[in-house]
Amino acid sequence: HIVSCMSAVNVINHIDREKYDVVIVGITEEGKWLYVDSVESIRDESWRDKSVGAVFSPDATEKCVLIERERGVEEVPVDVAFPVLHGLYGEDGTIQGLFELARLPYVGCGVLASAVSMDKLYTKIVADTLGVRQAAYVPVMRGELSHMESVTERVEKHFSYPVFIKPSNAGSSRGVSKASDRSELENGLREAAKHDRKILVEEMIVGREVECAVFGGGNGEVIASGVGEILAAADFYDFDAKYYNEESRTVVNPELPGDAAEKVREAARRIFTAV
């Protein structure tokens, strides 16, 4: 949740206020929607206490945010939504579905693309179909953990340790762990199962970790950014290493052998187009 707030501050600060009127709506961890009157209150985390209730109307004829005022409910018209929500409900097609219901234009991918991209298992199935190389994996369902020995034997049949365990549908490396033996594998499976009913166990690949952003418009053009190399200040790029360890960093356009960078960008474009 705090990551979403940090991202929202960055986005809002880069919007030209001379061109756009910004209506800020925050959602608490409990799911309460609030009208936020300043970026500063997000930055100092006081917005939960200082804000008033707000409701986004799904009425396609209204396209507005309803704000609770002492004198009554104020209707604030909205032309476009810019969701800045990490993880469940924000990146998985849920909030996108609400905007579709209201017929409100919004920034970002649509319902299906968001849902598929958020779910690691489905994304891997797409990558397999495209022939994009990726880490080998074994899918595990939460219900299978009642027969833990059978699950661990299946994993050990495919991989040697260490392996990575991930909830299929979760963000920011939540619930992700690395296992070097069976005991750690069992603990990692139980932890991942707290976040999703689908779990992935992946082989460990020793190498350099890189990332690439992709975006496209309605004209069909798909643009891939330059490649960034992740240098995690930890054993792997977990939640703390991503957001709290200041020694973690990303090198923009690192030196990579041959045409490796372009291969990364092309694979990213292909998957983006497919989903």
Q: What do these predicted ranges mean?
A:
Residues H1, A268-V275:
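Short, intrinsically disordered, charge-balanced linker/junction segments flanking boundaries
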Residues P105-C109, Q134, A224:
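Short hydrophobic/aromatic-enriched beta-strand-loop microsegments
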Residues Y35-D37, H147, G175-V176, A213-V214, ...:
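Short, well-ordered secondary-structure micro-motifs
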